């Protein structure tokens, strides 16, 4: 028992920095002044007048986010033991790791279901309605969170110490890994889109004035 307590304490303190650093990074990210690029009011107005169908990149990202939501909801239902045939087929034919008794995959899928899904809905809203300046920050935050979470999930499902019966079936390896990598990549692609062309998400400024002029006043 004393050995268990000693090992638990050592493991706890070794992992504490990895638990605290993301909170510190989030505080720094959301508290620092945003570096607003110089964009004219005319360009902002022109971008914000375009409908979703006239912004093909945003349209594709919206479709990908909808697919990610559907995939996340499916896996959430799977770990909640939903009796649907789709859930049964998925857990036994594609990702048996989700029923690993250690509980880690179940917790991950529930976190996705209750935290990632609402945020993805908000991001779809931001892609459809102009002036959502929070997209410039939250997309970066979400991209980092999903990349880390998916790295852990994919790595654990393929790890040699995971019982063989819970690993991804050989014949389903490519579709399962591709879907999981895509789930990690979509938020990063969205963050890159917001970073490289932020005009659609910026608040309108008086005509003829740049966003930099507004910031300086």
Predicted feature residues:
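Interfacial helix-start motif at the membrane-water boundary
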Residues: 95-115
């Amino acid at each position: 028992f004393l050995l268990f307590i000693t090992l638990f304490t050592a493991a706890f303190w070794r992992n504490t920095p990895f638990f605290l650093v993301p909170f510190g990074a989030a505080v720094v990210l959301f508290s620092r002044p945003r570096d607003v690029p110089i964009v004219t009011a005319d360009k902002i107005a022109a971008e914000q007048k375009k409908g979703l169908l006239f912004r093909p990149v945003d349209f594709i990202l919206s479709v990908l986010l909808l697919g990610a939501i559907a995939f996340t909801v499916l896996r959430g239902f799977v770990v909640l033991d939903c009796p649907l045939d789709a859930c049964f087929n998925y857990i036994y034919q594609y990702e048996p790791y989700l029923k690993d008794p250690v509980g880690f995959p179940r917790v991950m899928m529930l976190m996705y279901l209750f935290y990632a899904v609402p945020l993805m809905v908000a991001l779809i809203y931001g892609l459809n309605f102009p002036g959502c300046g929070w997209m410039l920050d939250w997309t970066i935050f979400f991209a980092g969170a999903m990349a880390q979470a998916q790295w852990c999930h994919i790595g654990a499902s393929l790890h040699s110490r995971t019982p063989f019966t819970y690993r991804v079936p050989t014949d389903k390896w490519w579709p399962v890994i591709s879907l999981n990598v895509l789930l990690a990549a979509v938020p990063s692609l969205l963050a890159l889109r917001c970073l490289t062309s932020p005009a659609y998400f910026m608040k309108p400024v008086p005509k003829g004035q740049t966003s930099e002029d507004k910031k300086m006043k």
